[in-house]
Amino acid sequence: MIDFLSGLQHRVVQAAADKQAFDILVLDLRERSDLTDYFVICSGNSRMQVQAIADSILDRVYESHYTLSSVEGYTSGSWIVLDLIDVVVHIFQKDVRRDWLQDRKSTRLNSSH
């Protein structure tokens, strides 16, 4: 999966995989957004695992001298967002991700009417 990635997004995906993140998804937003180039979305089973995934990614970011703009949601550990400027990482507990996807689907259905 990570063979086609380079640079920061590759490091993020590898760091997440190192902590057994699952359902890892990389979205290329370069043609769709002026705010970031990629979203990396992944899941963990518990608050502790989600925080461990975030810690692993942050360690890799610091080692590689990339810029961290902000971290949101770390304390609660249900949905952590790491803004690395060119890559925004969303790390969900699996139930929170499922609910988030349901909300997005509902919003799309309601906005199409």
Kindly give the residue locations of the regions a language model identified:
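N-terminal presequence-like segments and adjacent domain-start helices
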Residues: M1-L5
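N-terminal first-folded block
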Residues: S6-Y38, N45-R47
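Signal for well-folded cores of large energy- and translation-related assemblies
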Residues: V13, A17, A21, L58, ...
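Glycine/charge-rich, flexible interdomain linkers and switch-proximal surface loops
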Residues: D23, L27-S33, S69-D86
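Short aromatic/hydrophobic contact patches that present stacked aromatics
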Residues: F39-I41, V81
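Compact, glycine-rich, soluble single-domain proteins
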Residues: M48-Y66, V81
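C-terminal structural segments of small proteins and small subunits
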Residues: V81, I85-K105
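Conserved small/polar residues in nucleotide/adenosyl-binding loops
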Residues: T107-S111
